[in-house]
Each structure stands twice: as C-alpha cells, then as structure tokens.
C-alpha cells in the first residue's frame, strides 16, 4: 500500500491532507516495511510486509523501537495500536532466513538482530501507555514477541499462534521463557517443545491473547480505540471487554486440548525431555504417541535447551529471561542445527533435517550448561 501523495500547493492547504502527508513522512523512514501513523492521539504501527507474512526484519525493529520511545514520552500520544497488513498474518516471525545467511557468513546480524529484538520486546513489556496488538492472522515467533508482552492482545477467528522453533534448531525465544511457564499447568512446556498450534478463541482461552473479537469487528474496534479520550488501562479494557461480549463465534466450541489437559500436565511433569518421551510412549494413547512422534522430529539440542529455558524462566523476571535467551540465541548461532533446520524447512524444503547430535542422549548436560553460561561483556544489557 503506497502512502505517496502527489498534490498541488493549493490542495496542501487541506489540514486532512497535511495529516496524511505527515503519516507518509513517518512511514517512509522505515522504507515502507513498517508504517507509522498518528490518528488523533493514537499511534498506529502497521507491519507492512504482507507477501512475507509481515516477517520481522532488523530494519523494522530499528524503526519501531525509537518510535515507541518517542510516543511513550509524547503528551499528544495516549495509546499505541500495532497490527499487520493484509489478511493472512499479524507477523509470522523473524526473518530467520536472513539471520541464517548472516550467521553462516560470520556477519554481525546474527548477534545484532536478537539483541535489538529482545530490547524491543522488553520495551513493549514495560510500556507505560496502553499498548494494543491486533493479532489477526498468523502470529508466531517474532510476532509473539511484538504482542504477548503488551497489556492487550486481541485475537480473532483467523489467529494462528505457535512457537515452532524446536523444529528449526532454535528455541521459543522473544520472552517465551517468561510467558510460557506462566500458562496453566504444563501447557506452556507442551507448546514450547511440540510447536502445537492454537487457533482463534483458543489463543485467548490459554491467555496468550487477552481478548477475542470477531475479525469483522476489528475495523470498528480500532476506530473506537482511536476515539478514546486520554484512556486509562481500565478504559481500554472496558472497551475490549464490550467487543468480546459481542463476539459469539465459536463460543460453544470446546477448547481444542480440553480432553488432553490432564494428560499434558501428567505426561509433561518430568525432570528431563527423555523422561517426557518415556512417559508419552508408556502412556500409549493416540494423543501421547502423536506427541512422541512430533518430538522425534525436533532438534534434540533445541528440545534440551527449551526444557531448561522453561524451567529456569519460571523463576525469572522478564529482563532476566531476555538475558538468558540472548545467551541461548548466540549458542544456536554458533551451532549446527539452526542452519540445518532453516535449510530443511525454508530453503530446500525437504523437511528432513539432519540434526547433530541426532539423539537426546547425544546432547550432554555439560553442553547445555555451556549454552546458558555468561557471554561476559557480550551479555545482553537492558
């Protein structure tokens, strides 16, 4: 969507058009990958890579972060709304193909991307003004980081949530170590290890989203959010509550994991990934065996790092989690499985990654310890 406006000097006198030009000037700085607009006293961010499912790039991060900082201090900005362009995605994740290419070439992007992404995620998690993420469509990885730490996350029937990183030799980062262990029971660990996908109302039911609103009402909701006068967190919550009450779609449909919740809590209550796999195989139910089959496809290294990440993150502050995850990100950049996972899933698309080590037993506790160890002066500082 182009915001370039050609107009005569006479037409420039229109206040409305001047505001639109101001919106264009703000957006063009980001090379159109992300658009910024002031609508009244609302700051609106649009992730604008619809053909790439709004995948997050370093360029986008480097424009969103200072804009959020500016709006946070601006007395003329009362609320921030973030959304994705197009019908398919809010944000399908980070631009991991670019990160993999940079890492292979020894480019600093593989360090800088994660560092700046986590700093942005932390800014969202500590934002003082109402922050509303309209997560309509695919919301995975980096897209979760742009939404889940904010005060309000609005899912629709089109929302598709997952943290699929163990399947590409990574781990559920962007603060996954904070929000996942705080979901009910062992659900967060289950989602982290298996990459299980949640859709629509279920995203709100588990707490990843704060509200569920039918997609046909999102445009109206955004207008009403913009029209709020100096809104408090409570004012925004009341408006979102009212829209949720009017959204009856799938209300009678049971939670997709309703019948498996007890089994998840029981089978994933274990001291190691190996023990979880053993529990699943011993259980023998169709659900348990399917999860065992899923785990067998994932990077053994990623599974072990993720298990420890969720375990440690349950006792950490959000800032401590980001520091831990930055260490893990760099361990993955220095390893084998991330590059192999990206090759198998995104480049060659043969879906047959050759993990090294290829078994859980091959990933030693000493190696895992090393991945969590300090990077000294290269540690993330928040």
UniProtKB/Swiss-Prot annotation:
Pfam families: ECH_2 (PF16113). GO terms for molecular function: 3-hydroxyisobutyryl-CoA hydrolase activity. InterPro entries: ClpP/crotonase-like_dom_sf (IPR029045), ECH_dom (IPR045004), HIBYL-CoA-H (IPR032259). Keywords: Branched-chain amino acid catabolism, Hydrolase, Mitochondrion, Transit peptide. CDD domains: crotonase-like (cd06558). Signal peptide: none annotated. GO terms for biological process: valine catabolic process. Its EC number is 3.1.2.4. Its main location: mitochondrion. One of its GO terms (cellular component) is mitochondrion. Substrate binds at residues 117, 142, 165, 173. It is an enzyme of class 3 (hydrolase). It catalyses: 3-hydroxy-2-methylpropanoyl-CoA + H2O = 3-hydroxy-2-methylpropanoate + CoA + H(+). Belongs to the enoyl-CoA hydratase/isomerase family. Hydrolyzes 3-hydroxyisobutyryl-CoA (HIBYL-CoA), a saline catabolite. Has high activity toward isobutyryl-CoA. Could be an isobutyryl-CoA dehydrogenase that functions in valine catabolism. Also hydrolyzes 3-hydroxypropanoyl-CoA. This is 3-hydroxyisobutyryl-CoA hydrolase, mitochondrial.
């Amino acid at each position: 969507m182009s915001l370039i406006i050609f107009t005569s000097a006479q037409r420039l006198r229109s206040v409305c058009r001047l505001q639109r030009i101001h919106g264009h000037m703000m957006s063009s700085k980001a090379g159109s990958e992300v658009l910024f607009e002031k609508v009244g006293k609302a700051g609106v961010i649009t992730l604008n890579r619809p053909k790439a499912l709004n995948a997050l790039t370093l360029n986008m991060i480097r424009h969103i972060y200072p804009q959020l900082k500016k709006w946070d201090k601006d007395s003329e900005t009362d609320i921030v709304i973030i959304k994705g362009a197009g019908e398919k995605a809010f944000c399908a994740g980070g631009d991991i193909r670019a990160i993999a290419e940079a890492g292979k070439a020894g480019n600093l992007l593989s360090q800088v991307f994660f560092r700046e992404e986590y700093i942005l995620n932390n800014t969202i998690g500590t934002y003082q003004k109402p922050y509303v993420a309209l997560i309509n469509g695919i919301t995975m990885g980096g897209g979760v980081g742009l939404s889940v730490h904010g005060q309000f996350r609005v899912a629709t029937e089109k929302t598709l949530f997952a943290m699929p990183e163990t399947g590409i030799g990574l781990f559920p980062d962007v603060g996954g170590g904070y929000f996942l262990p705080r979901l009910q029971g062992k659900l967060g660990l289950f989602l982290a290890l298996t990459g299980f996908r949640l859709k629509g109302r279920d995203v709100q039911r588990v707490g990843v989203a704060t509200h569920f609103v039918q997609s046909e009402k999102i445009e109206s909701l955004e207008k009403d959010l913009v029209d709020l006068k100096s809104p408090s967190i409570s004012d925004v919550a009341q408006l979102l509550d009212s829209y949720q009450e009017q959204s009856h779609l799938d209300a009678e449909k049971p939670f997709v994991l309703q019948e498996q919740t007890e089994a998840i809590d029981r089978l994933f209550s274990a001291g190691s990934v190996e023990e979880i796999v053993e529990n699943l195989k011993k259980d023998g139910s169709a659900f348990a065996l399917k999860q065992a089959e899923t785990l067998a496809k994932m990077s053994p290294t990623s599974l072990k790092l993720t298990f420890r990440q969720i375990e440690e993150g349950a006792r950490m502050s959000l800032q401590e989690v980001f520091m831990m995850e930055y260490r893990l990100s760099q361990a993955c950049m220095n390893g084998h499985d991330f590059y192999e996972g990206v090759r198998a899933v995104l480049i060659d698309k043969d879906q047959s990654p050759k993990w090294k080590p290829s078994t859980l037993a091959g990933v030693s506790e000493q190696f895992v310890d090393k991945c969590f160890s300090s990077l000294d002066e290269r540690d993330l500082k928040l």
